[in-house]
Amino acid sequence: MNINRVTSIYYSPTGTSGKIAEAVAEAFAASMNGGRSFRQISSAAGAPLETDVLDITLGGRRLQVNDSFAVIAAPVYGGRVAPTAAERIRMLKSEGSPCAVVAVYGNRDYDDALIELADLCRECGFLPLAAASFIGEHSYSTEEFPIAQERPDSLDLEKCAMFGSQLAAVCEELQQRLSQAGQDEKSVIMAELKLDIKGNRPYREYKPSPATPQTDINRCVLCGRCIDMCPVGCIEMKTFGNEEGLEEDMAIESDPAICTKCCACVKGCPFGARIFNTPYSEMLHRNCSARKEPQWSMAL
């Protein structure tokens, strides 16, 4: 089991999954590098563990991931792995690279998402050694109805560092055991790697909402940033005739058949022109305000 680098792989429309994955990967690399960051030892003697980032938010690509420890993170939508994340993770292939799977949810529950993510990574050829659930600000969180607002926060990032350090210890222990074992013993060691993950098979049914973010034309300046940040390309700048029929007006619209309600456009619009009014915001604020904490399990 060769580990020459640590790669954070994530689908992260609103930035929370990416922030968590990179923090875990950084802590893992620092621990494997003797407590120093890659930058601190990049000019020193020896071969430091390299760090890579594979952000699949705006598009996936077929890629072989080998000789790497991967931190694979995805958001939870309706108790499942975000469908677009699942599609893009399936494009990755590995020949037994160890990984940690991380489900990021908005303080309600991750339901079957974590076990689904672990299954998905196994199908791609990865070897999950750890599974974690972390909390990120809910996509439906608003100023009026905050849900896990500004998470991951400093306490969450401390947990990321703790998780990353523990991952490094698990990898080092496994590498040591494998290096001292014969071929038959290695097979036994690998067969004994089991993860205790909450969730059900078959997974719960995913039920997407038909609603989609709208545009406040009084605030929108037609800058097109929402178009650029949409992970599924569902936002367009459309032209239509005005009331007099003499000129053409332009407006930003989403295709509800494609929109995944990730709310990247809502949170990313610098003018507050993208709005998603859903009764779930108030419901989640009312019922899911008690702070939940990250949890994880290890295969060793």
PLM-predicted stretches and their roles:
Residues 104, 218, 240:
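Histidine- and/or cysteine-centered catalytic micro-motif in compact active-site loops
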Residues 1-20, 26-54, 59-210, 277-300:
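FMN-binding flavodoxin-like domain, especially the glycine-rich phosphate-binding loop
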Residues 215, 225-253, 264-281:
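Iron-sulfur cluster-binding cysteine motifs and their immediate structural context
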